[in-house]
Every structure is written in C-alpha cells, then in structure tokens.
Amino acid sequence: TKSSAASEVYKRQHHITLNGADKNTSIDFWQNILGMKFIFEQPNLDDLNTNHLYFDCGDGTTVTVFTNENLTPDKNKLKNECGGVHHVAFWVSQSTIRIAEKNLNDNGFANTGIKDRGFMDSLYFREPLGLLIELASYKFDPPIGFTHANVLEEAHKLRIKRNALNIQDEDIASAIKKLRQK
C-alpha cells in the first residue's frame, strides 16, 4: 500500500528550522531551558547575513534556528492560520517532561502544566518568539517488534468500537495484548 511504502522511504523527521532573532535568545531557550545541546553554528548558506544554529534533540535529529543579531524577540503569539504551523511536538521521556515543566516554571515561562491525553502526557508552552511547543510523552511501551504507531492504530479501532471520544488506557492495554498474540 502507499502508506506502508512511505514508511519505508521516510526514516523520521530530519530537522526543523525556525526563524529566530538574536543568537543568545535561541541558545538561552533551546539549550539552557529545554536542555538541547548547542552543537554548532555556521552561516545560512542561502543568506550569508543570517546565522544558522544547530541544537541536538538527542536522537540524531536537530532543531536549527536562523538568527540575525539585528532582530529582537517579538513575544506575540504567532497567528494560527490556514497553511501555518499550529505547534511543533517533541517526543520525550516521562522524566524529561517533568524536568522541562520545572525548568519552564523556574524561568518564568507560562505553560499548561502536564495534561493527560489518554495515551500520552503533553506539556504546551511558547518559545521566546511565540511558536507553540509541545513536549509529548507516551504512557506505554509497545511490544517487541511493534511501534507506538502500531499500538495507536489498533487502539483507535478499539476506541471506535467503544464509541469513545479518545483513546484511553483500556484501549492501549487491549491493543498491546492483541499485538502480542500476532
């Protein structure tokens, strides 16, 4: 099928590049608040007046930020429009989401607190330039040989059968049990 062919081609997200302001704003937030190591910088090869910062997400992928020392942070919320990005989500561990919540609170960053989404916990906040960020942490481990997506796909089918609003713990537990029997 087309979807299974796509999963063979697309390994995972390579990187996200954001438009930033000055270098220090980006380093202070991405490294010092979220804990993503600042790994290097170089000129933006498409615009030599702009710098390009690289931060390690910890899994081999990066967040990169274009910076310009002539720009200052504008903390206004970005517009939520058709064709725009609503938010960027990072998959983190349960301990990381809790540490991040503490770091955000300790440094004056407004956030939602950790929200229970049924199959995962989420923490939402805005980075210094207004982009909505989500830290997402699954509350289950898939059986060996299966992915989180496999479990969620099966759990969704069970949720539909229950005529439920969203996937809950019982759907995840039943989905894992069903996958283990395959």
For the regions a language model picked out, list residue spans one by one:
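A short, acidic/glycine-rich surface segment
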Residues: 49, 71-76
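Vicinal oxygen chelate
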Residues: 7, 13-21, 54-58, 75-182, ...
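Short glycine-/small-residue motifs
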Residues: 62-65, 134-135
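Membrane-helix exit/interface motif
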Residues: 67-70, 96
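Core segments of cupin and vicinal oxygen chelate
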Residues: 19-63
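Single conserved hydrophobic/aromatic residue that forms the stacking wall/gate
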Residues: 1-6, 10
